[in-house]
């Protein structure tokens, strides 16, 4: 549908001033009359633009410290008036039609994110007039264009130039959708904030405030449609959070390869989150959301080589993540050695991309460097509900470890224990990881009994000819029986790191002492389901 409406009068009132001067100049140059409020009006006037204050247009001043500015029939009548149907009543009450509304809302999210923000601060940053104008204009999109995103400014001017100062109904409808999405997200933020403040408001523990609101409203933006979901009979799409700053698969830029699949995204997320746990140059190879090889070294090339050797069979068709820039030498090693679905790194050199480009099916993502892990919430959908928890960012330092065995670990055993403890956190429970000299040598994932995960890790190491004797073993949760320790001892493990906390801890510790194994408790569990 191409029904056009000329833009002759626009009302501009924005909190985010990015691009507004240039947009207003472009509108004015095309003969559009400008109405504006408060700070936006002052800014436009300072730039020499002919602008009419809304208070002058309505004959009613701003009042109550700016709480009442645009809530007036001459404003909303001009926006909501149906062209060709309400013309007589508009003329009778001297209401001029407003053809475009340019509004973005008070920065509520930024306000409540500031340290020390009080409930009163939050309340004063709840926009009333803005959402009202946005909804009015979106409702009357057949006649009015509503603009809530500065990223649309250029396209709007281009379309006006192509249509003699008019916008099509298709464009106005699309802008209306964005407007309703904008106000829905805004109201959700406010509802989430107020819901999370209920305990503090009633004088209860402040620790409960700001965490889990009474009603949870989530807003995600569709990034891409997919050919199918986890399986070919399932339809799927990928949605992302708006304004995410953390390096992630959601914010990563795809610089090469065909479109990411549902499973690509899930596995890439698992690989990237694991590699973020390491400060040294690291490589993580993931298959079906589980690490199948992890290593740290002095270079990502050596880290990749060592991670690959853990389980070359599983690495085929896997996802590879690095915490350093992908260089040409490493790219060549990967391409010449294995089939890979996705490579993700903070960045990639031009030479590396030329090499990976030779394999058109290889997807390469760059996500930018990260400073530290960002706290947030994890969600798990269950039928009829949603489980919500803090992200598992828990880590233990060497100083927090407790040696509970008779034998103390050697320095190398301690380093290996801390390394495989980091890896175990990202392996599906029940998780067992064997490691030696900063590389995994066997990973047992997702078994219903812990002892079988331990046995599988040993089998994996033996299959690849990796020496288990003198290695460390990490378990994501406590050992309910001594059998896991016996299985580890049988293949030569010399140090075990685990949370502890079983009613049979003494039995398990006794097994370690019997085998001469050093045992470390972390007092922190890392289930992953």
UniProtKB/Swiss-Prot annotation:
Keyword match Hydrolase: yes
MGS-like domain ranges (all copies): 1-148
Protein name: Bifunctional purine biosynthesis protein PurH
Domain notes per entry: The IMP cyclohydrolase activity resides in the N-terminal region.
Molecular function terms, GO-annotated: IMP cyclohydrolase activity; phosphoribosylaminoimidazolecarboxamide formyltransferase activity
Reaction catalyzed: (6R)-10-formyltetrahydrofolate + 5-amino-1-(5-phospho-beta-D-ribosyl)imidazole-4-carboxamide = 5-formamido-1-(5-phospho-D-ribosyl)imidazole-4-carboxamide + (6S)-5,6,7,8-tetrahydrofolate; IMP + H2O = 5-formamido-1-(5-phospho-D-ribosyl)imidazole-4-carboxamide
InterPro entries to which the protein is assigned, alphabetical: AICAR_Tfase_dup_dom_sf, Cytidine_deaminase-like, MGS-like_dom, MGS-like_dom_sf, PurH-like
Record GO biological process: 'de novo' IMP biosynthetic process
EC number: 2.1.2.3, 3.5.4.10
HAMAP family in the cross-refs: PurH (MF_00139)
Record gene name: purH
GO cellular component, one term: cytosol
SUPFAM superfamilies hit by this protein: Cytidine deaminase-like, Methylglyoxal synthase-like
Key words, A-Z: Hydrolase, Multifunctional enzyme, Purine biosynthesis, Transferase
One Pfam short name: MGS
Keyword Transferase (UniProt): yes
Family that this chain belongs to: Belongs to the PurH family.
Pathway membership, UniProt: Purine metabolism; IMP biosynthesis via de novo pathway; 5-formamido-1-(5-phospho-D-ribosyl)imidazole-4-carboxamide from 5-amino-1-(5-phospho-D-ribosyl)imidazole-4-carboxamide (10-formyl THF route): step 1/1; Purine metabolism; IMP biosynthesis via de novo pathway; IMP from 5-formamido-1-(5-phospho-D-ribosyl)imidazole-4-carboxamide: step 1/1
Native source species: Salmonella paratyphi C (strain RKS4594)
């Amino acid at each position: 549908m191409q029904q056009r409406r000329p833009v002759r009068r626009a009302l501009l009132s924005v909190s985010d001033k990015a691009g507004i001067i240039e947009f207003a100049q472009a509108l004015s140059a095309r003969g559009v009359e400008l109405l504006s409020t408060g700070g936006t009006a002052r800014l436009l006037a300072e730039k020499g633009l002919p602008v009419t204050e809304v208070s002058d247009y309505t004959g009613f001043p701003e009042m109550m410290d700016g709480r009442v500015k645009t809530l007036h029939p001459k404003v909303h009548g001009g926006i909501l008036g149906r062209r060709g149907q309400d013309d007589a009543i508009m003329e009778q009450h001297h209401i001029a039609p407003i053809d475009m509304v340019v509004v973005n809302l008070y920065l509520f999210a930024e306000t409540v994110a500031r340290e020390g923000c009080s409930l009163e601060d939050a309340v004063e940053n709840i926009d009333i007039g803005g959402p009202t104008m946005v909804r009015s204009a979106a409702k009357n999109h057949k006649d009015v264009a509503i603009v809530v995103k500065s990223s649309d400014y250029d396209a709007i001017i281009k379309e006006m130039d192509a249509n003699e100062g008019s916008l099509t109904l298709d464009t106005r409808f699309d802008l209306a959708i964005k407007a309703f999405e904008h106000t829905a997200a805004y109201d959700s933020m406010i509802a989430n904030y107020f819901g999370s403040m209920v305990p503090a408001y009633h004088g209860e523990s402040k620790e409960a405030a700001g965490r889990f609101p009474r009603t949870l409203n989530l807003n995600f933006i569709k990034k891409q449609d997919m050919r199918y979901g986890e399986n070919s009979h399932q339809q799927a799409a990928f949605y992302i959070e708006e304004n995410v700053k953390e390096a992630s698969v959601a914010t990563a830029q795809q610089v090469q390869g065909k479109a990411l699949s549902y499973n690509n995204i899930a596995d890439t997320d698992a690989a990237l989150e694991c590699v973020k746990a390491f400060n040294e140059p690291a490589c993580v190879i993931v298959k079906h959301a589980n690490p199948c090889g992890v290593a740290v070294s002095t270079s990502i090339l050596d880290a990749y080589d060592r991670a690959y050797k853990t389980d070359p069979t599983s690495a085929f068709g896997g996802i590879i993540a690095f915490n350093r820039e992908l260089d040409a030498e490493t790219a060549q090693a990967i391409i010449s050695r294995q089939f890979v679905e996705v490579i993700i790194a903070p960045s990639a050199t031009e030479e590396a991309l030329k090499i990976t480009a030779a394999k058109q099916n290889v997807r390469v993502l760059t996500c930018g460097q990260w400073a530290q892990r960002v706290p947030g919430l994890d969600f798990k959908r269950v039928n009829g509900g949603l489980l919500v928890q803090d992200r598992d960012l828990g880590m233990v330092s060497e100083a927090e470890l407790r040696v509970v065995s008779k034998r103390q670990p050697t320095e190398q055993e301690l380093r290996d224990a801390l390394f495989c403890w980091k890896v175990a956190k990202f392996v599906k429970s029940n998780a067992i990881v064997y490691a030696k000299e900063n590389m995994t040598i066997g990973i047992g994932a997702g078994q219903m009994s812990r002892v079988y995960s331990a046995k599988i890790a040993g089998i994996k190491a033996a299959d690849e000819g990796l020496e288990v004797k003198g290695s460390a073993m990490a378990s994501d949760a406590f050992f309910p029986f001594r059998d896991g320790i016996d299985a580890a001892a049988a293949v030569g493990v010399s140090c075990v790191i685990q949370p502890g906390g079983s009613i049979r801890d003494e039995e398990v510790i006794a097994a370690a002492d019997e085998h001469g194994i050093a045992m470390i408790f972390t007092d922190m569990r890392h289930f992953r389901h």
